[in-house]
Amino acid sequence: MCKIAICDDDKEYREKIKTVIETEGILSSNEIRFYEYESGKELLEDADILHDLIFMDMRMPGLDGNKTVLKLREYNEAAILVFCSGCFEPTPDSINVGQPFRYIMKDL
């Protein structure tokens, strides 16, 4: 079972990512378990779940994507990380500690 976390304060964007993965992905829907989070705080509360893939919004109220990933990597170094952003501005922390697999731009 592939555990995929989607951490974004925009519910519509979370649904969009799920839809793309379900319709275009290589795994069938019964091989995927989605976990949705509205904030970095919520994701960190579930840190005991070792997600395989994490889609992380860069800009959220409270803990932003960078701060969340810095803390999350203490629990889960192996997860594949994809940063999602409306603007492309990676920081040294997000690159070095987060070690993202990809940055993807949100539709504006």
PLM ranges: what are they?
Residues 54, 78-89:
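A short, hydrophobic beta-strand element within the central beta-sheet of small alpha/beta folds
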Residues 8, 57:
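Active-site residues of response regulator receiver
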Residues 61:
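The feature encodes the CheY-like receiver
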Residues 47-50, 72-78, 98:
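Conserved phosphotransfer cores of two-component systems
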Residues 10-35:
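Two-component/phosphorelay signaling modules centered on CheY-like receiver
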Residues 33-53:
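Acidic, metal-coordinating helix/loop segments flanking the phosphotransfer/catalytic sites
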Residues 39, 64-67:
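Acidic catalytic/metal-coordinating carboxylates
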Residues 67, 88-104:
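Alpha4 helix (beta4-alpha4-beta5 surface) of REC/receiver domains from two-component response regulators
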